[in-house]
Amino acid sequence: MLMGSIARRYARALFSLAVEQGRVEPWNDALQVLKNAVEGSPDLRDVLSNPVYSKEQRRAIVEKLASALKLEREPANLLFLLGDRNRLAYLAAVVDTFRSLADQHLGRLRARVTSAVPLDASAAQAIADRLSQATKATVLLDRAVDPALLGGVVAQVGSLVYDGSLRTQLEDLRKTLKQ
């Protein structure tokens, strides 16, 4: 609970600055890249959160990372700030909250679509289009693969779940046959 409220504070502050500067989408993209870079490198995460390294050393590393990733100053400053305050563990929550605020601001919804096999681009677009029609909003897909579904897809948009998986259909058939 505490992590969520702290992450929201950082995300809202950065988001309001992004809105003022008209940089919501670019910063959202930059924050996703930053999050992936830090999560993808345990060594980097350790260095940035290890008090053995001075703030100056950590800041120099963040500057090199920001330069390598071609980040704007403000998204990079988030990493400086979290590192300086020993709150690097909040980075993922801050970025996810910022993304939610950006999606809401831009009138988008995110749908988690799980399929038994990877979806090709045309199938993913068809699902996004159908979900957009159903929700009357622009829908962006976060795709996942779960072979246990056997076939079909499960789409979750907010609290709504559309389950068209073969696994569920077989379970429903089994229940019907037992009656």
Curated annotation (Swiss-Prot):
Domain of life, per the record? Answer: Bacteria
Q: Which UniProt keywords apply?
A: ATP synthesis, Cell inner membrane, Cell membrane, CF(1), Hydrogen ion transport, Ion transport, Membrane, Transport
Record membrane topology: Peripheral membrane protein
> Does this entry carry the keyword Transport?
yes
Localisation per UniProt entry = Cell inner membrane
Q: Which GO terms describe its molecular function?
A: proton-transporting ATP synthase activity, rotational mechanism
Statement: the UniProt record of this protein carries the keyword Ion transport: yes
Subunit comment? F-type ATPases have 2 components, F(1) - the catalytic core - and F(0) - the membrane proton channel. F(1) has five subunits: alpha(3), beta(3), gamma(1), delta(1), epsilon(1). F(0) has three main subunits: a(1), b(2) and c(10-14). The alpha and beta chains form an alternating ring which encloses part of the gamma chain. F(1) is attached to F(0) by a central stalk formed by the gamma and epsilon chains, while a peripheral stalk is formed by the delta and b chains.
Q: Which family does it belong to?
A: Belongs to the ATPase delta chain family.
* Role, per record: F(1)F(0) ATP synthase produces ATP from ADP in the presence of a proton or sodium gradient. F-type ATPases consist of two structural domains, F(1) containing the extramembraneous catalytic core and F(0) containing the membrane proton channel, linked together by a central stalk and a peripheral stalk. During catalysis, ATP synthesis in the catalytic domain of F(1) is coupled via a rotary mechanism of the central stalk subunits to proton translocation.
Protein name per UniProt: ATP synthase subunit delta
Species whose genome carries this gene: Anaeromyxobacter sp. (strain K)
